[in-house]
């Protein structure tokens, strides 16, 4: 076979068009500074911001993950990517100590929206928002930027402003996305043969050189001659899938006129976990899944020449199911602890008669997923506000007075369904 090699030299000429324009467009960018909206170039405080359209480029069930790397000075730590579990940590330029808190103050549409959940953890509505309903996220970092919040802003402040209506014809936007989650790297465990050899080595140190596994067992593990008596099980591979699916469908309406401006959003997010699908294992269905429904309705109404009303309503409904059927089913910690601690030769996944392997109901992690039932958690979060603004131009041009009221409601319920198996 003859090989032909060709050396190709190419020259590329790049022409870059250069034009000059007035600086007015770039200087007209507005940024929120807590109590007002100001031209970005006029702000001397340490402030950074990101638009909601930029956040929407990252398809993730948790909005907090989208903020990572997009706001200088903000550190986002991810404790878990389990569907429906919000375990992020937020730090702005390190940690503060006011009241023992480390997280920044979260302000959504002018109101502080942090609450303590049933487990005593500090939570915020930010994690339940969708990028499509966010206008901008602004990070206030230094003392001059956070001064109006006093000690509460000691750890920095995150300002989130949701989208509102515009004086324009109706715009309808529909989005549909499908994505997949995949572990960055799965741990590799010893097979039964290597495990038995190392076990013999450790056993011999404390038992005068005696061997726990004999030659017959070692040969069976090595050659795989009897998968029931001498099993070799990769519990990660047996219990988990390679990928998890994500779905998102959204519809929003935006528009208005001189009297009424509106923004309405409907959104659905679905996320399945990495656990094996239970219908593939038994006749019961308790698949791990997470569903979230978001509704937003923001309206601005000019009641009269001087009086205007601003109505904000955001609703997030969550439904989470985790197989397991016990209190440990609140999350997957128990499952991962089990599959990491089980030796590969402990027992087969199924016995010769197709019953589940294991010496007790709690031993087989795959059986627990398929047969033990499920833990279901529901939450409802309502965030609403009404703001009235009266212009007082007759007293002083540009003078106005505003009053606002906010109502937040958070509901959390759960149910536990479990059963034994043979």
Q: For each of these PLM feature ranges, what is it?
A:
Residues 1-2, 371, 421:
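Secreted/periplasmic carbohydrate-active enzymes, especially glycoside hydrolases
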Residues 1-295, 309, 357:
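Short, small/polar-rich motifs associated with maturation and membrane association
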Residues 133-136, 146, 153-183, 259-348, ...:
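Transmembrane beta-barrel strand/turn architecture of Gram-negative outer membrane proteins
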Residues 229-232, 363-369:
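Short glycine/proline-rich turn/loop motifs
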Residues 236-241, 369-376:
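Asp/Glu-centered strand-loop micro-motifs enriched in Gly/Pro and often flanked by an aromatic residue
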């Amino acid at each position: 076979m003859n090989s032909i090699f060709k050396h190709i030299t190419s020259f590329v000429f790049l022409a870059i068009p250069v034009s000059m324009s007035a600086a007015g467009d770039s200087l007209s960018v507005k940024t929120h500074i807590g109590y007002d909206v100001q031209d970005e170039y006029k702000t001397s405080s340490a402030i950074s911001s990101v638009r909601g359209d930029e956040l929407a480029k990252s398809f993730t069930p948790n909005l907090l993950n989208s903020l990572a790397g997009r706001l200088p000075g903000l550190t986002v730590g991810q404790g878990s990517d389990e569907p429906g579990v919000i375990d992020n940590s937020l730090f702005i330029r390190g940690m503060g100590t006011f009241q023992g808190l480390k997280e920044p103050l979260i302000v959504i549409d002018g109101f502080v929206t942090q609450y303590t959940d049933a487990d005593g953890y500090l939570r915020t509505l930010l994690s339940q928002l969708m990028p499509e309903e966010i206008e901008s996220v602004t990070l206030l970092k230094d003392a001059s930027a956070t001064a109006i919040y006093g000690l509460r802003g000691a750890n920095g402040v995150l300002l989130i402003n949701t989208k509102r209506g515009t004086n324009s014809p109706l715009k309808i936007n529909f989005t549909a996305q499908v994505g997949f989650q995949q572990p960055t790297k799965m741990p590799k465990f010893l097979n039964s043969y290597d495990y038995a050899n190392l076990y013999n080595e450790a056993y011999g140190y404390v038992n005068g050189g005696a061997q726990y596994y004999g030659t017959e067992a070692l040969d069976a593990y090595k050659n795989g001659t009897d998968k029931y008596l001498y099993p070799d099980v990769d519990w990660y591979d047996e219990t988990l899938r390679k990928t998890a699916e994500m779905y998102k469908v959204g519809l929003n309406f935006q528009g208005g006129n001189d009297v009424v401006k509106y923004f309405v959003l409907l959104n659905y997010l679905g996320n399945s976990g990495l656990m094996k699908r239970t219908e593939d294992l038994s006749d019961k269905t308790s698949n791990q899944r997470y569903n979230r429904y978001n509704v937003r309705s923001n309206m601005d109404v000019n009641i009269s020449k001087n009086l205007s009303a601003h109505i904000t309503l955001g609703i997030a409904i969550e439904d989470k199911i985790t197989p397991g059927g016990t209190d440990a089913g609140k999350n997957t910690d128990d499952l991962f602890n089990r599959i990491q601690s089980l030796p590969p030769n402990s027992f087969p996944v199924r016995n010769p008669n197709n019953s589940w392997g294991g010496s007790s109901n709690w031993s087989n992690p795959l059986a627990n997923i398929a047969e033990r039932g499920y833990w279901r958690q529901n939450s409802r979060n309502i965030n609403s506000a009404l703001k009235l603004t009266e212009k007082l131009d007759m007293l002083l041009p540009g003078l106005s007075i505003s009053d606002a009221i906010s109502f937040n409601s958070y509901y959390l319920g759960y149910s536990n369904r479990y059963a034994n198996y043979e």
